[in-house]
């Protein structure tokens, strides 16, 4: 495993972080024991950076992560970097954004309990909340840093001007945006902003929500409780087009003697503004395949070939809270 310093945080983190969105109930049923084994295997293979969120099952994902790392959180706490996110609230009508000071404080306390830790290394605002001023949100997190409950503050799904507004009260230390071969809009604004301000970037969705694993087809049937079952990007003509693009990528990956998953993850890490790629897994075998991507180097010619292949694909966006 390779490591890097996460922007201005000073945290030494593995270039691939273990993500836990898939353990929160939005991706269908899963075997919890297998998921715990996957987390533990990731740690054995050198991963020291783990990302979760209060909204991933509202405590469920955090509890699984805490259980999987229970011994390590006792014996090697200083070697682990635990990141979580807050600022979403579940209502009868679905998820809503709530980055109010009161909800963030409650969220931090709930996450500490669910994870079984006394502090959170990196706490991120999950989505910008247009109903609460950036100064209020940032001010509340600054107090939580002073209280010792969180170590560093980041944001997720923010654009450049939202980060600038937030930083007027408290410097944004990290950004967690969506980024993969089928979704590259942050290359124009957010990534240059982060490079200019030494903001650590940990990207989520490098496998395009499963599309870049090469395991999906027109015959794939998503479970009813998997958000992709109602997503237009995983059906219809755009999906067919992207499956053809994935097949072409898989052929190129084979030429490089890597899997398509490894190629996709390595591509995100090849961007000089990206520090870390967050990759989720439910099984040990998925972990071992994904982590090997940290050692894959892509030449400029390789990147050009990938760009040519991707020019035939359609954009793949993920869900927002309002769509979950």
Model-derived features: where do they sit?
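Active-site beta-loop-alpha junctions enriched in small/polar residues
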Residues: 21-23, 53-55, 85-89, 125-128, ...
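N-terminal binding-site loop/beta-alpha segment at the start of enzyme catalytic domains
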Residues: 1-80
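Terminal-tail/helix-coil boundary detector
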Residues: 1, 224-251, 255, 270-275, ...
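Conserved, mostly hydrophobic/aromatic
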Residues: 6, 18, 35, 50, ...
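Aromatic-lined glycan-binding groove of carbohydrate-active enzymes
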Residues: 186-225
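Short helix-capping segments at alpha-helix termini
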Residues: 71-79, 115-116, 144-149, 167-171, ...
